[in-house]
């Protein structure tokens, strides 16, 4: 599993608590070196590694991104979506089985005053279907505006 935008390692922690270490190999990536430092000292084990970066270094069965693209570094929606699509394309190249990511959504793409990116679900699906193939979405009623996108090879 590659976890892009791993932050403080919440997904690694979840896997550690719910699976035996022989059941998974996890590699967390983040562009923030402080997050990687924190995770590298918190999580010890041959099956868990952390690296500075924004994409996997090798093929992985699953590439996940949870909340990775919610905080935009620009107010320019087209620029942010170009960045998002470029990152998704790079990650897809390393996904052997599936790529899974979530985004905040609204009827029209926008970036809030707090720099939270809200995607138009149809725009994301159209991009993913045209570049990667059939794309499924999951909505959880308890997470308003959150949509998880899954693309399986």
Predicted segments — roles?
Residues 5-9:
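Class I SAM-dependent methyltransferase "Motif I" SAM/SAH-binding loop
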Residues 10-49:
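Class I SAM-dependent methyltransferase SAM/SAH-binding core
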């Amino acid at each position: 599993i590659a976890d892009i935008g791993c932050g403080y390692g919440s997904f690694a922690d979840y896997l550690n608590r719910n699976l035996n270490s022989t059941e998974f190999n996890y590699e967390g990536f983040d562009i923030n070196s402080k997050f990687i430092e924190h995770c590298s000292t918190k999580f010890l084990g041959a099956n868990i590694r952390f690296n500075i970066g924004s994409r996997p270094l090798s093929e992985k069965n699953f590439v996940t991104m949870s909340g990775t693209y919610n905080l935009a570094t620009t107010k320019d929606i087209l620029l942010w979506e170009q960045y998002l699509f470029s990152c998704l394309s790079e990650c897809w190249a390393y996904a052997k089985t599936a790529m899974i990511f979530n985004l905040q959504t609204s009827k029209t793409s926008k970036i809030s005053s707090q720099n939270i990116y809200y995607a138009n679900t149809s725009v994301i699906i159209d991009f993913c279907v045209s570049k990667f193939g059939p794309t499924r979405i999951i909505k959880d009623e308890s997470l308003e505006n959150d949509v998880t996108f899954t693309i399986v090879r």
